[in-house]
From Swiss-Prot:
Keywords linked to the UniProt accession: Cell inner membrane, Cell membrane, Ion channel, Ion transport, Membrane, Transmembrane, Transmembrane helix, Transport
Gene: mscL
InterPro entries in the cross-refs: Mechanosensitive_channel_CS, MS_channel, MSC/AndL, MscL_channel
Role, per record: Channel that opens in response to stretch forces in the membrane lipid bilayer. May participate in the regulation of osmotic pressure changes within the cell.
The name this protein goes by in its record: Large-conductance mechanosensitive channel
């Protein structure tokens, strides 16, 4: 066998089924993340914000130092703030994505287990009990062995 080149090694690695499956999973996961982020930001959080007094969670922040504004109204120095609302939003996104992935994996596991149980070979049937004739013949054989 000759030496394999770097490109041949990379091609062999990249064409493995697991790597391709993982790449597809990453792409689908990225798209799924965007869908869930939109669901959280546009569907789930507005009613929750309404219930707690019309709060938009992404706007929640703690201003540690106010912005400095000049006499002409232009901002001289930006405000220093801790934007914890965006953190809350990202946390809700994560929890919902994690829960959705958990449900998906649980479904796949159940289907795989069910399919494996259906495909599992049945235990071989127990051999039938010997008939009366077979028992009698066995006893005769044993008696003949004893006489020898």
């Amino acid at each position: 066998m000759g030496k394999s080149t770097f490109l041949q090694d990379f091609k062999a690695f990249a064409m493995k089924g697991n790597v391709i499956d993982m790449a597809v999973g990453v792409v689908i996961g990225g798209a799924f993340g965007k869908i869930v982020s939109s669901l959280v930001a546009n569907v789930i959080m507005p009613p929750i914000g309404l219930l707690v007094g019309g709060v938009n969670f992404t706007d929640l922040k703690w201003v540690m130092k106010a912005a400095e504004v000049g006499a002409d109204g232009k901002e001289i120095a930006p405000a220093v703030s801790l934007d914890y609302g965006q953190f809350l939003q990202a946390t809700f996104d994560f929890l919902i994505i994690a829960f959705a992935i958990f449900l998906f994996i649980r479904l796949i596991t159940k289907l795989t287990t069910k399919k494996a149980a259906e495909e599992a070979p049945a235990a071989p049937p127990a051999p039938p009990a010997p008939t009366k004739e077979e028992v009698l013949l066995t006893e005769i054989r044993d008696l003949l062995k004893e006489k020898k």
